[in-house]
Amino acid sequence: MKKKALITGVTGQDGSYLAEFLLAKGYEVHGIKRRASSFNTQRVDHIYQDPHVDNASFILHYGDLTDSSNLTRILQEVKPDEVYNLGAQSHVAVSFESPEYTADVDAMGTLRLLEAIRLLGLEKTTKFYQASTSELYGLVQETPQKETTPFYPRSPYAVAKMYAYWIVVNYRESYGMYACNGILFNHESPRRGETFVTRKITRGLANIAQGLEKCLYMGNMDALRDWGHAKDYVRMQWMMLQQDQPEDFVIATGVQYSVRQFIEWSAKELGVTLTFEGQGVDEKGIVTAIEGDKAPALKVGDVVVQIDPRYFRPAEVETLLGDPSKAKQKLGWTPEITVQEMCAEMVMEDLKVAQRHALLKLHGHDVPVSVE
C-alpha cells in the first residue's frame, strides 16, 4: 500500500516542492487548494494528474483552513498517514494589514486540523507536521537561535504562528499525537512568491536589466537573514515525520547575510556591479560597471535601487540566524544548495521571463506590470 500524504498549501512554494518529493518516493499525495476566480495551480501544473484516471497519485481537493467542516470531510475521505500543514497567510507585512484573517488561518487553521484528526480517531495513525517560522524569535533573545531560544514575536503573523506552535505541542503531549514543528528560517527558490523580498529583488532587477522597470524600491536593507533553498527544507520536513518519536527542529543553514548583499549578488548574476551611496532613506544603489549582455537597458551611473519608507515594518526583525545542529546530529540533515547558488537560479529564471516580456513589448504587446 502506498503511503498517503495530505498537504495544505500545496500550490505554494514549499507545497509544490514537497509534492514532487513525496511523489518521487512513491506516495499518494493529496493537496488542498483554495477556490479562486482564476487558476492558482501554476506551481503544480507539471505534476497534475487527471482525477478520472485510475490510480492517480496526485489528487487536489478544494478546501480552506478557515472551514473546519471542510477540513474534517477531506481528512475523513483521505485518512492520510502524514499531514503537512504548509498553508498560511505567510506575508509578515500583510499580517499588519489583515491581523484577524492571519490569526484565523495561521493559528485557528492549525487547531482545526489537529482537532479534526483527533475527533476522527486518527490521532494514533496520522503524523502531523507544522510549518513554523523563525519569525517566532522576532526581537531575538540569543544568537544563533535554536529550539530552546525564547520566542519574542514582532508581528501578527508571528503571534499567530506562536499559537500554532504551542497548540501542536499541546496536542502532542495531551493526546499522544505524532505532531511536530519545523521552525523554518527563510527559504527561497524560483517559486517564491513575487512579493517576498528575495523574489522581489531577483524579479525586479531582471526587469530593470531588460528595460521593463526603472528602479527597485526597498525597505530595510540592513536586515540580516539566514536563507536556504526550499528543496532542502522540504526534505527535512519529510525526515521529521520518519522518526520514532516526534520532536521540534530548527531548519536553517547557520549562515546569515544582509538584504543588501542579496541585492549585490543578484546584480552580479546580471553582469552588473552596484555601489551603495548615502544613508538611511537616502541610500541608493548605483550601477558602476556592466559586463556581458544580460542588462542591455542599463548604463553606468543609473540609479536602480532606492529606499521607500513604506516598506519598513512597524516592528522590525533585524537579525535571524538559525542553529541547525540538532537537525544535523539527530537526523543527519544538512542543506545541499548554497545561498549563492539559489540566488543565481532565481535570477536566471526571472531573467528568462523578463527577456520574453521585453520581446513582447518590443512588438507592441502589453506585458504584466510589477507587483509590490
UniProtKB/Swiss-Prot annotation:
Q: Which SUPFAM superfamilies match?
A: NAD(P)-binding Rossmann-fold domains
Residues that hold NADP(+) according to the record: 9-14, 64-65, 86-90, 101, 161, 187, 192
What cofactor is this protein dependent on? Answer: NADP(+)
Lineage top rank: taxon:
Bacteria
Gene Ontology process terms (BP): 'de novo' GDP-L-fucose biosynthetic process
The record's catalysed reaction(s) read: GDP-alpha-D-mannose = GDP-4-dehydro-alpha-D-rhamnose + H2O
Q: EC? A: 4.2.1.47
| This protein's UniProt keywords | Lyase, NADP
A Pfam family found in this protein is GDP_Man_Dehyd
Copy the pathway line from the protein's UniProt record: Nucleotide-sugar biosynthesis; GDP-L-fucose biosynthesis via de novo pathway; GDP-L-fucose from GDP-alpha-D-mannose: step 1/2
Q: Broadest EC class?
A: lyase
Q: Where are the transmembrane segments?
A: none
Function summary: Catalyzes the conversion of GDP-D-mannose to GDP-4-dehydro-6-deoxy-D-mannose.
| Record's protein name | GDP-mannose 4,6-dehydratase
Native source species? Vibrio cholerae
